[in-house]
From Swiss-Prot:
Molecular function via GO: protein heterodimerization activity; wide pore channel activity
Name the record gives this protein: Gasdermin-like protein rcd-1-2
UniProtKB keywords: Cell membrane, Cytoplasm, Membrane, Necrosis, Transmembrane, Transmembrane beta strand
Gene Ontology BP terms: programmed cell death
GO cellular component terms, A-Z: cytoplasm; plasma membrane
The species this protein was found in: Neurospora crassa
Known partners and oligomeric status: Heterooligomer; the heterooligomer with rcd-1-1 forms a ring-shaped pore complex when inserted in the membrane.
Chain segments carrying region Disordered: 1-22
Family: Belongs to the gasdermin family.
Length: 244
């Protein structure tokens, strides 16, 4: 499983659809393979929510099972202030040059993740013929007409995979803070070498469980980008990955 291919959903109230319902184009859940969404900021804003074309025989639904998985985001911030002597400080001790630097260092690392004991991945590999039929559906066609850009370009995203958390999961938030004063004084002694004593650093970590969900739900989706520029005669399809 490649985490970069999966986009976590912020909500936990999306019950998973069954495989037969997805194959027939009438999924029993609000988020399904075959759904079309407008952009990466609105992962649950389904355009063709009333249904879609049934999957052809050559578009089977593949499954994979994983244990002990987690998805989440990390937000790092770092603040450093440093001062350094502009030139070696001479003549404090005859024959010894002294250099120095000192500063403040503060870091804050926040982790917001979901942990799952068991997840099941459902995925399809859509054909161009099938996507052509999806794009001709009433809701998708109307959206494309309204959202066309300069020279007639447009873009939508198709859900090609869903990840289902079996038995729910835990939302864990942890924060690590570090702060300290650092500094060193360097001594250059002819014939002996250099010495540079330094001071230390302190970190604190705090972890808490924000929520514990106990029923199956769709926790992430996999997407392909379907786009057409005004200079091309046909649309293109590209797998989408998250940026970390």
């Amino acid at each position: 499983m490649d985490n970069e291919e999966w986009f976590p959903l912020k909500q936990t109230h999306y019950p998973p659809p069954t495989i037969p319902s997805m194959k027939t184009g009438h999924p029993t859940g609000p988020i399904s393979i075959g759904h079309i969404i407008p952009d990466l900021r609105h992962l649950d804003n389904v355009i063709n929510c009333k249904g879609f074309e049934p999957f052809p025989p050559n578009m089977d639904v593949f499954t994979a099972h994983y244990e002990q998985c987690h998805f989440g985001d990390h937000l790092n911030s770092e603040f450093v202030v440093q001062a350094k002597a502009a030139a070696p400080i001479k003549n404090i001790v005859p024959g010894v040059d002294v250099t120095g630097s000192a500063g403040l260092h503060h870091t804050n690392i926040t982790s917001d993740r979901w942990e799952y004991d068991s997840v099941v991945e459902y995925a399809v590999y859509p054909t161009r013929q099938y996507i052509d039929r999806l794009l001709e559906s009433k809701e998708v066609k109307q959206y494309i007409q309204k959202s066309k850009k300069l020279l007639g370009g447009w873009c939508v995203y198709m859900v090609t995979g869903i990840m289902v958390a079996r038995g729910g999961g835990r939302n864990v938030v942890s924060e690590e803070k570090g702060a300290g004063v650092f500094g060193n004084v360097g001594f250059q002694v002819p014939g002996i070498g250099e010495x540079a004593p330094e001071v230390g650093w302190d970190t604190k970590t705090k972890t808490k469980v924000n929520a514990h969900h106990t029923t199956d739900f769709v926790c992430a989706i996999r997407l392909v980008k379907i786009a057409k520029s005004g200079l091309r005669s046909s649309w293109t399809m590209k797998k989408v990955t998250r940026e970390f």
